Amino acid sequence: MCGIVGYLGKKDAFPILIKGLRRLEYRGYDSAGVALINDNGDLNVFKTKGKVDNLVEYCSDKNVSGSIGIAHTRWATHGEPSAVNAHPHYSESRNLAIIHNGIIENYADLKVKLQAKGVTFRSETDTEVLVQLVEYVMERKELDLLTAVQVALYQVIGAYAIAIIDKRHPDQIIAARKQSPLVVGIGEDEFFLGSDASPIVEYTDKVVYLEDGNIAVLKRGEDLKVVSILGEEQELVVKKVDINLGQLEKGGFPHFMLKEIFEQPDCLTNCMRGRVNVDTDNVVLSAVIDFKQQLLQAKRFIIVACGTSWHAGLIGKQMIEQLCRIPVEVEYASEFRYRHPVITNEDVVIAISQSGETADTLAAVQLAKDNGAFIYGICNAIGSSIPRATDTGSYIHVGPEIGVASTKAFTGQVTVLTMLALALAKEKGTISNDDYMHIVKELHEIPAKIKEVLKLNDRIADLSRTFTYARNFLYLGRGFSYPVALEGALKLKEISYIHAEGYPAAEMKHGPIALIDSDMPVVVIATHNGMYEKVISNIQEVKARKGKVIAIVSEGDTTISKIADEVIALPDTIECLEPLLATIPLQLLAYHVAVCKGLNVDQPRNLAKSVTVE
């Protein structure tokens, strides 16, 4: 949620920190700040409410010199968005400054104890408690900074990724993580910190992903040192990051979201590369090959996810049940972890997360592991926490997704779930050879068909202007199209701030039909499938109540075009792959409605790209 950046080296830290914050803007934030130690040993902290641009403007006449610093973008959890509550926070003596991502659950108790010792607080945040606690421990027990951080964190309950600097030690940064991501970049005589690798890749491709309970010591002139909270030295695992800087730029598009929508043909080609072989009509997933026994012996699959990933899981459920004949449950990770679920060693739990850092999904994974389940991860961010916590899994390989509203990650997740279902079905013998080859060929053609759908962009932009007046939308679908309706409604809510609901089309008559009138646009996914005639009846019911119908139909459909107000035709494909095509016009519709309303498409209000707290 929040963004952490740090630098220690020989260069001017401020521009590196600001550029790093801009790389992390996609995560969502409401304030920003920076702390630097200059050559005179002064610790300068500057912070503002609002965007990084506000911070840059505020600092234009300030002393921002120094070759060591930390910076932060905050998304409020404790305390309202304000300059006072923004990070970095400094200690009472102003010797220490800290930035933090996460939630300290026992901060109130710690604060009361510190206040009883005479410590004065400036902000309403849980983070300030950390820096005051570190200083209190440091002074009362005459400890060095690293030991003081260890002692302080031992008293903390909750999740955190932190970076702390001390003006009395201008040659080091102490960083630590627990249940919140933190990455250290290793350069030539310099170190970098980031919530993810995006602020780092411009300077080095060598990174260390800190594990839970790790504390990193970044010290000028020395090698990186990582210890546990108890002081035990940890093995350094240095990895190479493969991110193209061009993936972090808009590339001529007005917004990242539109760029990422248009990247989907190439993204899905990358997702299938080396996995779908059209010459041999075969799908090969290394995870299925390496862990065939565990996957085939499973009596049940449980998919855990949040948000858009949960919608992908609903499609995966239908795919796996239909092709593999295995019962599948789809759970919100946030609910799953607290409802005392029955999990056994005969279960396979599939955890889906774009970032690989979603707090609730990570907790659900740990719960499932503790109960003996086999864990399969589906993620985009390589080296993130969920892939490291699972037994096996598949990356979706769609590249960094910067827009807060997920687009290419969703279709990548659905593609991986499709490949998983196909690979398992073939191993289990639950699919005929003809059906298997037919689906593989159709899957291989999906990127080209998405390119055809994207040619409708201008038309969708035009019709979007017609619906910016709407205060409510209804999205309807059946079968594989129902999760697409949910995803379409979510996209509209996220970036246009228009209330929207997704429903199974047949459920419309059980409540939502009471809302339909001439001011209610209704988006219906009505492609040729086994329930086509029934969906036509649902459209007739909407029209009878003067609702405005936007229909997503199969190419060549002449029936629905006679009754719908707007029709968007998709290339033909088989039913189980229709979500990969039908979701594209819904992404474009949401995007263009938001643009027509003049809204910030890439950074919608109150939303964060990576939800790393509960």
Residue ranges and their predicted role:
Residues 68, 96, 300-302, 348, ...:
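Structural motif
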Residues 264-268, 272-302, 392-521, 594-614:
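Active-site phosphate/pyrophosphate-binding segments
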